[in-house]
Regions:
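Single conserved hydrophobic/aromatic residue that forms the stacking wall/gate
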Residues: 1-9, 13
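Intrinsically disordered, low-complexity linker/terminal regions across diverse proteins
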Residues: 10-281
């Protein structure tokens, strides 16, 4: 971790939006008719367009949310330099206050770390702490970042989740770079936070798994899915996110603590040597 990264990250941390906004949007002027689906969509679109147009020339509302509270998602907004975690993403089976700390750190902690890292990925790094499009890194730091990031591009270029016309269809490393950077940064930040929280406390195994193993299992389980091949083809060609399995295996293969947690042998598929491991920050 560099001082540059740490101080800037603390600025983002101060601008968290968690659960729900302080000010609720007034929908009194929007007509909703349960018998008119098309009309509802059209009127809602018009309502939103008018609301946004009315913002032109007005002071920036840094308290505005881009997601509604029930949304099961999270985001980092570079132009606002803030993170948003709606209530929907903070509920079971993702975050569960009844669960042990380890899987919660792996799952929700990984999400928080992911969004924080977006402030320093290939796009987020182009915005300064006030949300202005400004190159605030030195040329030396920028060049080193590009060099390290190319390691991830090469790694993900080698992943193929599906075939098209009987030929392997490979993930696009450059298209997915920002999200892959955030996934890697996310799991590393979450693991560091987890170990800091558990410092000085004895390991608490559960169902035969150590705490470190529980952490990585929690990180992985959030990405369980069953996708049709046709959908995978579309996703690989257009989605800036990697397919779910590589959002797990892609990051952790670069985390040496993962290999240690599961006592992986040096020649195992999920192990990289120190020389080949992608280290960004």
């Amino acid at each position: 971790s560099t001082p540059l990264y740490s101080s800037a990250a603390s600025d983002v941390y101060k601008r968290q939006k968690i659960g729900y906004p302080e000010n609720w949007r007034d929908y009194a002027a929007l007509t909703v008719d349960r018998t008119d689906y098309y009309g509802n969509v059209r009127r809602a679109s018009e309502f939103e367009s008018r609301r946004r147009i009315a913002q032109i020339g007005m002071p920036i509302d840094r308290g505005e949310w881009e997601m509604t509270p029930p949304t099961v998602n999270a985001y980092y907004n570079a132009s606002m330099n803030d993170m948003n975690f709606p209530a929907g993403v903070l509920l079971p089976p993702l975050f569960d206050p009844k669960m042990d700390a380890a899987p919660n750190y792996g799952n929700t902690g990984g999400t928080i770390g992911h969004e924080l890292t977006h402030g320093f990925d290939d796009e987020g790094r182009q915005f300064d702490g006030d949300g202005n499009l400004k190159d605030w890194w030195s040329k030396k730091v920028g060049a080193e970042f590009e060099k390290r990031a190319s390691c991830l591009v090469k790694q993900y270029d080698g992943y193929s989740p599906v075939k098209e016309n009987d030929k392997p269809l490979y993930v696009k490393g450059k298209l997915t770079l920002g999200e892959n950077l955030a996934d890697l940064g996310g799991v590393k930040l979450a693991y560091a936070a987890f170990k800091e929280a558990r410092k000085g406390q004895p390991d608490a195994p559960l169902n035969g798994f150590t705490e470190d193993q529980q952490f990585f299992l929690g990180f992985a389980q959030g990405w369980c899915q069953n996708a049709r091949p046709q959908m995978l083809v579309v996703r690989v060609k257009t989605d800036p996110h990697s397919p779910a399995e590589f959002r797990v295996n892609g990051p952790v293969v670069n985390v040496k603590e993962f290999a240690s947690a599961f006592q992986c042998k040096p020649a195992a598929k999920m192990v990289k040597t120190d020389k080949n491991r992608c280290e960004i920050w």
